[in-house]
């Protein structure tokens, strides 16, 4: 059982008792209203909930124009890209030692080679 004070109508964000300057004690307030929570009430509440966008508070779906034109001939090739941040330690080593730089996309160690 949940006990709750009745809602008071008035300007939003202001307590109507604050304008009159009257402070009421617990014994002079209006009686608390009882809200009984039962399994039936909860089942009814949850059965009304929905995961679909069929409620009036949902706006209709918006379609956006495509950012890229559709591909004329899509190809199944895979582009492997290596994050350039992994080359920072190599660049620092080259700056310290003055070595000749290796090719930008050098062969990876055997553990990193992938076959498709």
Swiss-Prot record:
According to the record, the segments passing through the membrane are none
Quote the subcellular location field of this record: Cytoplasm; Nucleus
Q: Where is this motif: Nuclear export signal?
A: 88-97
Q: Does the keyword Cytoplasm apply?
A: yes
Positions of the region Disordered?
1-22
Write down the superkingdom of origin: Eukaryota
- GO CC terms, sorted: cytoplasm; nucleus
Q: Which InterPro entries match?
A: HCFC1R1
Region: Interaction with HCFC1, residue numbers: 54-57
Q: Which UniProt keywords apply?
A: Cytoplasm, Nucleus
- Function (record text): Regulates HCFC1 activity by modulating its subcellular localization. Overexpression of HCFC1R1 leads to accumulation of HCFC1 in the cytoplasm. HCFC1R1-mediated export may provide the pool of cytoplasmic HCFC1 required for import of virion-derived VP16 into the nucleus.
User: Could you describe the subunit structure of this protein?
Assistant: Interacts with HCFC1.
State the name under which the record lists this protein. Host cell factor C1 regulator 1
Q: Which organism is it from?
A: Rattus norvegicus (Rat)
The gene name reads Hcfc1r1
């Amino acid at each position: 059982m949940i006990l709750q004070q009745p809602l008071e109508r008035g300007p939003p964000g202001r307590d109507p008792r604050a304008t009159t300057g009257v402070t009421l004690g617990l014994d002079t307030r209006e009686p608390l209203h009882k809200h009984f929570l039962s399994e039936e009430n909860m089942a009814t509440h949850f059965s009304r909930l929905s995961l679909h966008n069929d409620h009036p508070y949902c706006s209709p779906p918006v379609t956006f124009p495509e950012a890229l034109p559709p591909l004329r001939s899509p190809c199944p090739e895979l582009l492997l890209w290596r994050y350039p941040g992994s080359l920072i330690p190599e660049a620092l080593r080259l700056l310290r030692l003055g070595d000749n730089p290796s090719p930008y996309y050098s062969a990876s160690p055997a553990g990193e080679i992938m076959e498709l």
